Amino acid sequence: MRYARRLVAGTLAAGALALSLTGCGESVDPIERLGRKATQEPSQTPSASASATAPAPDSAGAQGGASDEAYKKWGLTAPVQYAPKPAQKPQIPKAAPGKVPVIDRIPLPAEEKIVFLTFDDGAEKDPEFLKMAADLKLPISMFLTDSVASSDYGHFEKLRDNGSASTVNNHTLTHPNLRTLSFEAQKKEICGQQDKLEKRFGQRPPLFRPPFGNYNDDTLRAASECGVSSVLLWRVSMQINNFQYAQGSALQPGDIILAHFRGPSELKGATEIQMTTRMLQRIQEQGYRIGRLEDYL
């Protein structure tokens, strides 16, 4: 239970720290940079068997790791280590009636050095990143914003379907600061993207991440009414070269890592692949394995 209490306390702190973790240092928010770009409606529809959550990987998939040589191809000096699906899921505190729980770290014992990868927005659509993610079998929880991702939802469908059990989740229609909106306006942003993602990917996403990490009680009520099961925040954000921490100066068991689908224009010339390689190196340097977030919820 002490892990559950720690999670609740951490959630309160993360709300105040979230904006600084996305908007300072080497990072530039791609939504703010791109503005309200016109995007085309996705023309494809999901197949009868498609779903927003790909089938869980077998022992050769994300939880068993990539091929022995794949890591060298992408600039790593050792294979990425993956955590198996837990025999029993951690205890997550329940939300008040009519709301959804807010999670910023998975409550794990100190000896379970496991972290989780999440990528936001969808501005960058680098085909080489698709190859990297498939080769390494990275289990990525995607949080997509329609205003930048919808110009090529097919890119993220390929990422979901690459055998790593990556998932598609909700990051609003237009990436607003939800605290500034009424309940009805928040519900439109959240439910609207739920509807679009369900239509395009075949399943209503269970997870929602508020832009900038900003939310209030209306957000939690709106998310519940839109069919969301949990609001996901984070404790660590990947910048261009290094992590930025909400607490301390190192990864902690259960940390949810925030990264973005970004390219050279947002990363000061670095590519999405270079940023991801550095992120994986930092995880390895601290002796952590990567888990599939949804397996722990």
Segment roles from a protein language model:
Residues 100-109, 270-297:
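C-terminal domain-boundary segment and adjacent tail
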Residues 175-181, 265-266:
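A short acidic, helix-capping loop that chelates divalent metal ions and anchors anionic groups
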Residues 115-119, 140-144, 167-170, 206-209, ...:
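Structural recognition of the beta-strand scaffold that forms the well-ordered cores
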Residues 134, 139-141, 167, 183-216, ...:
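CE4/NodB-like, metal-dependent polysaccharide N-deacetylase domain
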Residues 1-28, 44-46:
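Secretory targeting and sorting signals
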Residues 24-105:
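N-terminal low-complexity, Pro/Thr-rich disordered segments
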